[in-house]
């Protein structure tokens, strides 16, 4: 059996502004996310997937101010967005990323269980351990956990 998921990542591509129908707030635009989710469900896709990273990509050589100036768009936190999408869809699965390195097990389980209950059993979890020192700094650490530490958590 084949399952088809939509990677819901609207409006964050750096060159996306050049498209004539582009919106500048794509990463946090609720009407856009709602419309895409409903269209995916109408097309009989199996799941919507929302990825996450807990830091702004550092693509400007370690200069955070240049990164912030050059990448003004934000993006939605997956579990909050999926809870909202549960209310405007009926069948499509709702999958989101949560980092085991920087999220507490009880809180994560509670949030995912809540989405699962609200959606009638449609929640899915993309478990990641995160990848960067930038993410670690957002949680009071100087550097990211070692590979062994990440997988021991």
What kind of feature is each model-predicted range?
Residues 1-88:
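N-terminal beta1-alpha1-beta2 module of alpha/beta enzyme domains
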Residues 2-6, 48-50, 92-98, 121-127:
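Hydrophobic faces of well-ordered beta-strands that scaffold small-molecule active sites
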Residues 7-26, 100-153:
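Flexible, glycine-rich active-site loops centered on histidine and acidic residues
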Residues 74, 97, 104:
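Glycine- and other small-residue-rich loops at beta-strand/loop junctions that grip anionic moieties
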Residues 86-89, 96, 102, 119:
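Generic hydrophobic/packing signal
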């Amino acid at each position: 059996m084949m399952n088809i998921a939509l990677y819901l990542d609207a409006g964050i591509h750096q060159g996306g502004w050049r498209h004539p129908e582009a919106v500048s707030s794509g990463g946090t635009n609720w009407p856009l996310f709602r419309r895409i989710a409903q269209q995916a469900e109408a097309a009989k896709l199996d799941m919507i997937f929302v990825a996450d990273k807990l830091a702004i990509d550092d693509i400007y050589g370690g200069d955070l101010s240049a990164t912030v100036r050059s990448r003004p768009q934000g993006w939605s936190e997956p579990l909050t967005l999926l809870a909202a999408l549960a209310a405007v869809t009926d069948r499509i699965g709702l999958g989101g990323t949560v980092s085991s390195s920087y999220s507490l097990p009880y809180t994560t389980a509670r949030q995912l269980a809540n989405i699962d209950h609200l959606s009638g059993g449609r929640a899915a979890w993309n478990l990641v351990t995160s990848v960067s020192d930038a993410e670690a700094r957002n949680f009071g650490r100087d550097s990211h956990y070692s590979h062994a530490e990440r997988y021991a958590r």
